[in-house]
Amino acid sequence: MNLKELMKESLKYTLRDWKMLILVGILLTLASTIEEIHITHETLAIIFLILSLLLLLIEEGYRAKIIETTLHGNNMPPNLLKNPKGLIKEGFYEVIILVGYSSIISGIIYLMLYMGFNGSIYNLNFIIAVTLLSIFCTIFLICFLIAPINKAINDDKLIHAFKIHDLLKLYHKMGLSNAICSIILGITGFNLVVAPILNWGILDTYKFFEFLISFLLSPLILLFTTRFLSLSVKEVADKEIKTIND
């Protein structure tokens, strides 16, 4: 598929089941709302924290299910209400990937800040080091976006989510336009869907607009971006299988 076909197919997939969109919207709204509730009572705070984590696991598990069904050729969004335990289990692995990459990227950023506070920013070695660290940070960020998909196409083995060389090869085989679009959509999707649940989002809007984003926009972005990334990787994987068979 070319870029236009990928966009068209992803949009059709997203709008194919409006009931699922509503359910996903409710899930994301609950998750982002609970995260912003400030509770002083210790017991209630723990309960809300556990509930927030469960909703995050379900959201990430649903994302994993979209990836899985797309790779298997299914053209309908998966049922959010079917097998919630399975979604939580899948979500747990997705969160491990999230935490793993977040830790690496945070470590690189911390190292750059440490160097900035403890050395001259005009020193040539410092400039070279920060440039290299920035490149590494960018590489890990873009690899994180398709890491769950690479795990899915390799028998769901978690180690494949962290094989940087394989992930970069997938981007290379997508083609420049598809790769750039995948990166932009992936970053946008993460910031508008996952980040608000974790309270990491860069958006600082009024509550009404936050509600609209969580309930109306986030479900669309979740399904569209995940479908687009999955289809892009699926096409690469299918071509490799065809080449091997030929």
Where are these regions (language model features)?
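Juxtamembrane helix-boundary/capping and inter-helix hinge elements in multi-pass membrane proteins
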Residues: 72-74, 173-174
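Low-complexity, intrinsically disordered extramembrane tails and loops of integral membrane proteins
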Residues: 1, 237-246
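Short, small/hydrophobic-residue-rich motifs at membrane-helix boundaries and re-entrant hairpins
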Residues: 19-73, 94-114, 134-138
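A cross-kingdom feature marking solvent-exposed beta-strand/loop segments within repeated
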Residues: 74-80
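Selective recognition of hydrophobic, aromatic-rich stretches within alpha-helical transmembrane segments
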Residues: 42-72, 122-161, 196-198, 203-240
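Short, tandemly repeated low-complexity microdomains enriched for cysteine and small residues
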Residues: 109, 193-194, 198
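Interfacial aromatic "cap" segments that immediately flank transmembrane helices
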Residues: 2-31, 81-104, 143-194
